Amino acid sequence: MSASAFNFAFRRFWNSETGPKTVHFWAPTLKWGLVFAGLNDIKRPVEKVSGAQNLSLLATALIWTRWSFVIKPKNYLLASVNFFLGCTAGYHLTRIANFRIRNGDSFKQVIHYIIKGETPAAVAAKQTASTSMNKGVIGTNPPITH
């Protein structure tokens, strides 16, 4: 590629509607950090991966991937980053679901775990602890006499 052809291509990129002088370039470029963080989470134990966070990332990825083809100018960089963000979030949600099902949870329990982040045993333990604490507190204080 000759120098003049390179200069022309660079100038066209620099001054384009989705070039580095616009938010249409920088927002998707910086959003790749979320994709790389999701890829790094593959090494984390599945118990440490947040279902609610990945569900949110999947939802935003689906919405913004579609939106990037609707807006003018079409933003393929935004579409690509959101597509891969959705892929990593979907992968983590699949990991969580498979892990919970292997541990004996039903589909309903898996959905509850993804949204709330609590296992049924943890919910039951929390309810037991709160009822036992309430039994010990209510009505046990002696009356105040002066």
Swiss-Prot record:
Compartment(s): Mitochondrion; Mitochondrion inner membrane
Coiled coil region boundaries: none
Disruption phenotype: Grows more slowly in amino acid-free medium (SD), when combined with disruption of MPC2.
InterPro entries, per database record: MPC
Segment annotated as transit peptide: 1-20
Membrane-spanning residues: 23-39, 55-71, 78-94
GO biological process: mitochondrial pyruvate transmembrane transport
GO cellular component, one term: mitochondrion
Gene Ontology MF terms in the entry: pyruvate transmembrane transporter activity
Stated family: Belongs to the mitochondrial pyruvate carrier (MPC) (TC 2.A.105) family.
Assembly description: The functional 150 kDa pyruvate import complex is a heteromer of MPC1 and either MPC2 or MPC3.
Extra remark: Present with 6750 molecules/cell in log phase SD medium.
Function: Mediates the uptake of pyruvate into mitochondria.
Name by which UniProt lists this protein: Mitochondrial pyruvate carrier 3
Organism, scientific name: Saccharomyces cerevisiae (strain ATCC 204508 / S288c)
Annotated gene: MPC3
